[in-house]
Regions:
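Detector for the c-type heme attachment site
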Residues: 36
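Intrinsic-disorder/low-complexity accessory segments
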Residues: 6-7, 12, 18, 22, ...
C-alpha cells in the first residue's frame, strides 16, 4: 500500500497532486488532517509532541495548545478519553499537518480509534463498546471546537498568517540566503524532476551567473564556486519556510524519538 499522508510535499501520486493543488487555491489559516488509529487508542488531538521543526513559529506552537485546551473542555464534559503531546510530532514535511504548518497555517492531526477493525461497533480491550457513531461524534466535536476557537481568534490568526509570509519575502527564513543546484548535463533528468517538484510546491527559482561562496553538500565544507547557468533557489520568497525545510543540509533535532522519517534533504537526492 502507498501512504498518501506521506506524499504531501513529493506529490508522486495523482491524488496528492490534486489535493495540494486545491490546498494552494485556498491557503487556509487552519488545516486539520483527520485520521483513525488502532481501536484501543483514545482520541488524539493537538498540541503535538517534540520534535518540532525550528521554522515553526511561536504563534503556531501557542495556538496548537489553545485549540487543544478548547477540545479538552468538551471531551472532559462528556467523559471521553483523549491524549495530547504524545506520538505525533511536527517534523517530517510531507504530512497533512506539517505541510500546512510550513506554509503558514496551524496544521494538526486528529486521530480517532477505530480504523478498519472498528466496523459498526466493536468491543475494545477495556471492554467498552466503540460504535461508528461514537467515532464520528468525536471527530464532529473537534471539528466544531476547531471552528469555534478559530473564529474567536480570527483577527490574530489572519495577522500572524500575514506576518509569516511578510517575514518570508522581506528577510527569508533560515541561515542560508539561497541554494544552488548544479545544472550538469549528466544530471538532466534529476534536475528536471527537481524543477517539477519545485513547481508543484509553488517554490520560485531562477538561473545563476557569476561566482559565490557557500556550503558544499558533498564535501561538507564552505567553498568558492561558479554558479553560472545553475539553478538558484532564493530563500527570500513566499515559500521560504518550505525551502529551508526541504533544502537545509542538516535539520535540527531536539528529540531523537520521532514518529518515523528523519531524512529528506533534496540536494542529497
Amino acid at each position: 500500500n502507498f501512504d498518501l499522508n506521506r506524499d504531501w510535499a513529493w506529490q508522486t501520486q495523482i491524488e496528492s497532486r490534486r489535493r495540494v493543488s486545491v490546498y494552494n487555491e485556498w491557503m487556509p489559516q487552519i488545516h486539520v488532517d483527520y485520521h483513525e488509529q488502532g481501536l484501543n487508542q483514545p482520541y488524539y488531538f493537538a498540541p503535538a509532541v517534540q520534535p518540532y521543526h525550528d521554522v515553526i513559529t511561536s504563534w503556531q506552537r501557542e495556538f496548537q495548545s489553545t485549540i487543544g485546551k478548547n477540545h479538552a473542555k468538551y471531551f472532559d464534559a462528556k467523559g471521553w478519553l483523549f491524549f495530547t503531546k504524545e506520538v505525533f510530532d511536527l517534523y517530517y514535511p510531507s504530512y497533512g499537518d506539517t505541510y500546512p504548518t510550513y506554509n503558514g497555517a496551524i496544521g494538526m492531526t486528529y486521530e480517532q480509534g477505530g480504523g478498519g477493525a472498528g466496523g459498526a461497533a466493536v468491543i475494545n480491550d477495556e471492554g467498552d463498546t466503540l460504535t461508528l457513531f461514537d467515532r464520528a461524534n468525536h471527530h464532529f466535536t473537534t471539528s466544531l471546537s476547531t471552528i469555534e476557537i478559530s473564529s474567536i481568534n480570527a483577527g490574530k490568526l489572519i495577522k500572524e498568517f500575514r506576518k509569516f509570509f511578510n517575514d518570508a519575502v522581506s528577510t527569508g527564513i533560515g541561515e542560508y540566503k539561497s541554494y544552488v543546484i548544479k545544472n550538469n548535463p549528466k544530471d538532466k533528468e534529476r534536475v528536471e524532476s527537481l524543477l517539477e517538484l519545485l513547481n508543484k510546491n509553488g517554490i520560485q527559482y531562477g538561473t545563476g551567473s557569476g561566482t559565490g561562496k557557500g556550503y558544499n553538500y558533498n564535501s561538507g565544507k564552505e567553498e568558492s564556486f561558479s554558479f553560472s547557468n545553475d539553478i538558484v533557489i532564493n530563500a527570500v520568497q513566499p515559500r521560504s519556510a518550505m525551502v529551508k525545510v526541504l533544502f537545509e543540509p542538516k535539520a535540527k533535532l531536539v528529540d531523537s524519538a520521532t514518529y518515523d522519517i528523519t531524512a529528506w534533504a533534496l540536494p542529497y537526492a
